[in-house]
Amino acid sequence: MAPSFLTILSTDAILLDANLGESKSDVITALAQRIQDIGRSGDAEQLAHDIQAREDKSATGLPGGIAIPHCRTEAIAFPTIAFARLSHPVDFGANDGPADLIFVLATPVDGLISHTKLLSRLARALVHDEVLAQLRTAEDPTEVFQLLNGPLGNSGPLLPPAPARNNKLKLLAVTGCPTGIAHTYMSAEALEQSVRNNFPN
């Protein structure tokens, strides 16, 4: 059975306007500790190590001030997300500068499908400027939780579906990124959004 949204993220795992340090290692360590503190992991040190090991292979900074450090790990028993909106942005390797919106995603080692699915949903949601704006202006963790409930939970997509179209025009687009899978999902969502905007009928 797929995990429910309530088992993936809780308001206790959401930090707003937090100063978690000067480096991405500091941020990862702090969020791993937070995940342990709320009972989602029994080994924050191992969790931080596994996230950092994945980060060392390929930076997880994304355009727009976002980072999604992630890993598959034995330090947790079920998929978990923690979120921090940083008061002091930190460099996660994105070309456009440091990140202030940090999502840590960790799934069990035997949960490859769940890991990929969650990463896909999260990355696709974060393509949209309105989502980023709401994350940056949210006043409390509950507001963030409700915002993310769409793409991560079972309540459907964050944005309403595109209107029905006729089948006269068919478009095929292929995207891929050697940097990381999250970039690929974000590119795919951007392509789909461009088609919706430019081919309304």
Question: Where in the sequence are the language-model features?
Answer:
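Cytosolic covalent-transfer regions centered on His/Cys nucleophiles
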Residues: 1-201
